[in-house]
C-alpha cells in the first residue's frame, strides 16, 4: 500500500508540471529566456517565449531568414544553446516536443563565430554568463 501511494505521488509530481497550461506557466516563471536557438555564425538568434500571449516555438522565422538572406550552407541549420538536463522534470515537455529536434551547440562557439564575423555579441554574452 505504501509503495502504491509513493508511486502515485511521484507520478503526480512528475506529470502535473508537464501538463500544457501548467507547463507554460511554470516555464514562464522559471525558464523565460533559457531556451535559445541560433545558427552557426550567430546571424540568427531566437529565444523561446512562454508568456500566454506568445505563440508556441516555430522555425518559420528561421525559414524566412534563410529565404531572405541566403546564408552559407553551414549557417542554414538551427542549434539549441541549452543542454538537456533530465533532472529538470518540469522541462520534459519542452525537451520532448522541441529540444530533441535540434543539435546542441555551445554558446561560446556561437560567440566566437559572431566575433569573427563582426556581429554584436552583447545579447548572447549575457546568456553565456547566465548559464
Model segments located where?
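Extracytosolic and intramembrane catalytic regions of membrane-associated proteins
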Residues: 46-131
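N-terminal export/targeting and maturation segments
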Residues: 3-80
Amino acid at each position: 500500500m505504501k509503495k502504491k501511494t509513493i508511486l502515485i505521488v511521484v507520478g503526480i509530481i512528475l506529470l502535473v508540471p508537464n501538463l500544457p497550461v501548467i507547463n507554460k506557466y511554470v516555464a514562464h516563471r522559471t525558464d523565460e529566456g533559457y531556451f535559445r536557438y541560433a545558427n552557426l555564425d550567430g546571424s540568427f538568434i531566437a529565444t523561446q517565449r512562454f508568456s500566454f500571449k506568445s505563440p508556441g516555438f516555430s522555425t518559420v522565422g528561421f525559414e524566412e531568414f534563410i529565404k531572405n538572406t541566403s546564408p552559407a550552407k553551414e549557417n542554414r541549420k538551427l542549434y539549441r544553446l541549452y543542454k538537456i538536463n533530465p533532472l529538470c522534470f518540469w522541462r520534459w515537455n519542452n525537451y520532448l516536443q522541441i529540444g530533441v529536434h535540434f543539435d546542441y551547440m555551445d554558446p561560446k562557439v556561437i560567440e566566437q563565430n559572431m566575433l569573427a564575423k563582426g556581429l554584436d555579441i552583447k545579447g548572447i554574452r549575457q546568456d553565456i554568463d547566465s548559464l
